[in-house]
C-alpha cells in the first residue's frame, strides 16, 4: 500500500488510475484535481493540478484511451467538466462544461467505449443526464428524473460479445442508478423514443443508497452491488425469469455507513469502503455465499 502525502489541502474524495495504470487522478474538497505519474510501485510524481471547479470535487473518471487523454470530473458546484491533454504540449484544458443540473453533480461515469464517448452524470437535483460527444465535436444530452430526493451514483451495464453482435448499440445502453429514496433503478435506452426507460426497481435498503456497481461481463452471471447508509450491502442477480433477486453480502451489519463498493476487473472480488475507514474484500464461495477475503485499514 502506498501513501501519497500532502497531495491536497482538504479531504480527498476519489482516486482513479487510468486505463494503463500509468497515471493517477485525485480530487478533493480543495476544489482541485491532481494528476500523478506512476513510477514503479511506490513512486507517484505530481505532474499537474487542474483548477476549474468552484466547489468540492466529488469524483473523476478517465475516458478510454481510444478517445485521447480525457478526464471527466464532477462537483458540488453543479458542473461536470471534461478535461483533455493536448499531445503536442502535454497541457490540460477544459474542452466541455456540462451545466444542466441545478444542484451538486455527485458522480460521473463513461459508458463502455464500444458505445462511443458517452458520459453519465447523477445529481442531487434528482436527475440523471447522459451526454453524447459526437464525432463532429458537438454534444447532445438527455436529462430525466430518476430519484426524487437525489441521485448518488450510477454504473453502466457491461457489454459482452454476445449482446453486441448484429445489434444496434443503442438497444444495449443500460445502467443502474441509486438514490436517497433508498432505491436502485435500472434504465434502458429506447431509441424509438430517444429516452431512457425504467426497466427495474431494486428495493431492499432502509436508508440512502450511497453507491452502486455493476460487475464486469467476464462472469457467467451478472451482479449488481448496492452500498447503503443502512450499513448493509446487497448483491443483486437475475433469476431464470429475468427478475432481480437480492442477497445480503453478510448477515452482520457493517460497523458504520457503507460509502462505496467496487468490483475487481475480473468481477470475482467486491471491495466495500465504510465510515470506519476500512476497506473489506468479499468473494463468492462455491455454495453461492459471500465470504470475507481480507481487509485493508
UniProtKB/Swiss-Prot annotation:
It is found in: Cytoplasmic vesicle, COPII-coated vesicle membrane; Endoplasmic reticulum membrane; Nucleus, Nuclear pore complex. The keyword Ligase does not apply. WD repeats lie at residues 7-46, 52-93, 100-141, 146-197, 204-246, 253-292. Keywords: Cytoplasmic vesicle, Endoplasmic reticulum, ER-Golgi transport, Membrane, mRNA transport, Nuclear pore complex, Nucleus, Protein transport, Repeat, Translocation, Transport, WD repeat. It is a peripheral membrane protein. One of its GO terms (molecular function) is structural molecule activity. Disulfide bonds: none annotated. One of its GO terms (cellular component) is endoplasmic reticulum membrane. SUPFAM superfamilies: WD40 repeat-like. Its main location: membrane. One of its GO terms (biological process) is nuclear pore localization. Belongs to the WD repeat SEC13 family. Component of the coat protein complex II (COPII) which promotes the formation of transport vesicles from the endoplasmic reticulum (ER). The coat has two main functions, the physical deformation of the endoplasmic reticulum membrane into vesicles and the selection of cargo molecules. It also functions as a component of the nuclear pore complex (NPC). NPC components, collectively referred to as nucleoporins (NUPs), can play the role of both NPC structural components and of docking or interaction partners for transiently associated nuclear transport factors. The COPII coat is composed of at least 5 proteins: the SEC23/24 complex, the SEC13/31 complex, and the protein SAR1. Component of the nuclear pore complex (NPC). NPC constitutes the exclusive means of nucleocytoplasmic transport. NPCs allow the passive diffusion of ions and small molecules and the active, nuclear transport receptor-mediated bidirectional transport of macromolecules such as proteins, RNAs, ribonucleoparticles (RNPs), and ribosomal subunits across the nuclear envelope. Due to its 8-fold rotational symmetry, all subunits are present with 8 copies or multiples thereof. This is Protein transport protein SEC13. It comes from Debaryomyces hansenii (strain ATCC 36239 / CBS 767 / BCRC 21394 / JCM 1990 / NBRC 0083 / IGC 2968). The gene is SEC13.
